[in-house]
């Protein structure tokens, strides 16, 4: 009776595992063949796997498909393992590059050390160096970035100064003779006193208007007949009565 109970318990324990294997295999086969001309029915496949149905055509097809897919899955797993190993080795190789000098120093001093106190002091110094290593790397990158930013700022400031301060030759090319005829107004404010300011203003007026001020004389007196006549002759080409020929006047009267 004891042996029969043990066999029954073993069968009950094995049955769920075999059922789970059949279900997983048949479901995988059904997924792979669902777009094909003859898809595998997962229910019939699982029953044939458990030897509940005969003949086991669906299960045999599924076994052939699983045997074909097994090497492919193994190859993909191998590729994933290699990629994961490479991804893990990359940071380790970078760490070895930075830690190489410290490790060499440790190997050299290992043969020279004789007391455990020296070994502990060396290990502490090595740990401190390793802790400060990421900070140094961050500071180096930050200093490089700051240097690039300062260079860019300097270039921008130099460009701004060049644009604000133009060469006089460039001004002459751009404006031509305009600067020679009409000088800058800053010369009007150059004098310190009132007299200097008036003098500078007169000079600017003479430079700006040229002979116009010499041709039109502002100090003509109208009470003088000679000057009045000369002014009319110069400006309006009018001849005064005193300068006309009297005979011409009489001739006009006789003609009327």
UniProtKB/Swiss-Prot annotation:
Where does this one sit in the cell?
Answer: Secreted
InterPro entries referenced in this protein's UniProt entry, alphabetically: Opioid_neupept (IPR006024), Proenkphlin_B (IPR000750)
Q: Name one GO molecular function term.
A: opioid peptide activity
Q: Which UniProt keywords apply?
A: Cleavage on pair of basic residues, Disulfide bond, Endorphin, Neuropeptide, Neurotransmitter, Opioid peptide, Secreted, Signal
Entry PTM: The N-terminal domain contains 6 conserved cysteines thought to be involved in disulfide bonding and/or processing.
Q: Which GO terms describe its biological process?
A: chemical synaptic transmission; neuropeptide signaling pathway; sensory perception
Record GO cellular component, one term:
extracellular region
The source's domain of life comes to: Eukaryota
Task: Give the transmembrane region(s).
Answer: none
Give the signal peptide range. 1-20
Q: Which family is this sequence assigned to?
A: Belongs to the opioid neuropeptide precursor family.
What is the official name of this protein in its record? Proenkephalin-B
Classification of source organism: Eukaryota, Metazoa, Chordata, Craniata, Vertebrata
